[in-house]
Every structure is written in structure tokens, then in C-alpha cells.
Amino acid sequence: MGRKDGENLNSNTMKSRDFNETINGVASTASTECTNQQQWTKYHSKQGHGFAAEDANALWDKMHGKRVDKVGMDNSKNGADRIVNGVEIQTKYCANATKSVDAAFENGQFRYSGMKLEVPKDQYEEAIRIMRERIGQGKVPGVTDPNMAEQIIVKGHYTYDEAVRIAKAGNMDSIKFDIKTQAVACTFACGLSFAVSYCAAKSKGMSHTDALKFAAKQAAKSGGSTLITGVAAQQLLRTHVGRNFAAIATKAVKPIVCSAMNTEVGKNVLTKTASVIAGKQVAGVAATNVITKALRTNAVVNTVVFVGTSIPDTVRLCCGKITGREYAENTASNAAGVGGGWAGASAGAVIGSAVFPGVGTIVGGIIGGIGGGIGASLGVKKMFSFFK
């Protein structure tokens, strides 16, 4: 007979805490990737709302099933910001329609030949009128029909004011945007947690029904935790404190990455890792930048994950439900699980990619993450057991 939900779920059997810590660590890789796809480092600048508009509109397109390539992140002059289903789009979000359209002109001529010009949703009609005038004045090379303005101007999915708010922390527009950004990481955490928890429950003799219930609970916890910490990290990175933290992390990790790149083994490992992270072949300085960027953002994300997952134990400590020693052990184990999960996932993804690109990358990342996270977490607990 299968055991009931609730039986054997203590620390001596299910080890669900170890799984949760590890899954949070593995999921942080997905959360970091979601964060790195945004141009948050530029949100605080004078044109920060423009970069936020690019990110928000690109995300909207992705979530509506369109194929999006954010080619503009390399800041090439007069290049498209993104390519959507093969169509090049340049985004201009200024205070009014005249300024938004004028930003696409240089020396009196339209400088984005063959591209669509995306403007704030609330400026669309006025922008079309202005573009008609520009075409009539011969300022759009290769276009003579004013009615073509409707083919050139694209209505953005957000207003100018919404873009301004998305670039800032602490408001509903930016929080909703971050929730959408972290949806992928949340889904990943839910699926991984469900699978791991179900297998663990079945291995302990639980019935199929009870194992499903247990797995569903764990999936909800992991998904919710990943979503909350991911959003919190993105909100933090919009603040002065968050940017300073990221800058310190960059200064700390870049010399280490550069030193590793100077050795043959380090260069090979980091180049392969960078290629997996970037989703394309990169080398040299580009690989160094990819790794540094990933480590920088992950330091912030993992710190938020660690703090968030440590809150329950902190509350229990303050209420006298656990001892200081238990708190120290749980906290250290938590940190090891999160960090080990991320490190294991990164290493596993590289190995999996080498064996079977695509599927191997995903499977390797999951297996490596679980192994690394649980190994690190149990290692810390073993160390603490020596002092009992």
C-alpha cells in the first residue's frame, strides 16, 4: 500500500528541502538568462525608457508567438533594434510624435531605409501624419507615395508613459513586465520541481495519486519562489543599489575570467560555456564578456534567491522554533544548494551541448544542476555533522 501524503516528508526521508534548494539554484540559471536578455544596464540613462520600450515590445512579440531576434543589442549604427518574423524594426520612443519621427531622420533624410519605425501606441496616428509630410517633402529615399507612411510606421504595444515607468523600479508597469520576463524561468522551475519531487516520492513508496499531490505542491512552491525572486532581482537592478552591486560583482569576476582565459584549458571551457549561454559561437573578448555578464547577473539573482529562501528559517529562529546552530546549517546548506545548482547546471549544459547540441544542452543542464546542487548541499550538512 502506498504511503499517504505527509508521511516520510521529514528531513530524514524525502529531503525535499535539499531538492528545493537545488531547484532554486538550477532555476536561477533560467532567471539569469531572462534578465540578461533585457537592457537593464541602460534603463537609468536619459534614454532609458527607449531601451525599456525595445525590451517590452520585443517581449510582447515573443509572447504572441512571433520569431524575434534582438539584433540591436550590439548598438550598430543605423541598424534595426529587432527583427520580427523577418521584418526589421527600429523603435523610437520620445516625448511626442514629432520627436519620435524626427529621431529617425539624419541630415533631413530618413536613415532606416527598408525598416519599419515603431512609435509609442499613443502617438501612432500623429506619427503617420508626420511621416506622410516627410514623404511628400522627399525626405524618405525611395518612397514617393505619402500613403506608404502606414507601411513604415508601426504602432508600439506600449505608450510613452508606460515605457518610462517600465524603466523604473517600484511601479505596477515595471513589475508586470518583470513577471512576464520571468515566466519562462517560473515554468522551468515548476516543471523541474514536479518531475524531481514525483520521482522522489515514488522512490519512497508513495502511491501515484499522493506522489502527484506532493509533486504539485512542491512545483507550486518552486515556481512561486522563482517568480518572486526573479522579479525582485530585476527590480533591484533598476535601483542605484542594485547597479552598484552588479558593478562590484563585475569588478570581482572579470579578472578571474580573464586569468582563466589565459590558460588553454580555461579558454576552452569558458569559450564553450559562453557559446552555450549566448546560443551561438563566440570566442575571445566576446566570450569573456558573455561569461562576465552572466556571472555578474547571476550574483545578483542568486543573492536574492538566497535571501528569499532564508526568510522562513529566519522567522523560525526569531520565534525560537530552531536553534542558532540549525539556522547556520540550514543557511549554509541553502547557499551551497543554490550556488551548486547554478554551477552544476552551467557545467552540465556545456557537456550536454558537446554530446548532443540542443536537447543535450537542456538535459545536461538539468542533470548537472541537480547533481551539483544536492552534492553541495549535502556536503555542507556533512561538514556540520562533524561538529555535533
Outline where the language-model segments fall.
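Interdomain/boundary linker segments immediately adjacent to catalytic/signaling cores
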Residues: 1-51
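Catalytic centers of nucleases
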Residues: 29-107
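Helix N-terminus capping/helix-initiation residues
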Residues: 96, 120, 159, 205-207, ...
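A recognition module on extended beta-rich or small alphabeta surfaces enriched in W/G with H and D/E
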Residues: 98-151
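Cytosolic-side membrane-insertion boundary helix
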Residues: 145-217
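Small-residue-rich hydrophobic membrane-insertion segments
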Residues: 190-306, 312, 330-383
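Membrane-helix boundary/interface segments in integral membrane proteins
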Residues: 309-329
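Cytosolic/matrix-facing juxtamembrane and C-terminal tails of multi-pass cellular membrane proteins
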Residues: 325, 384-388
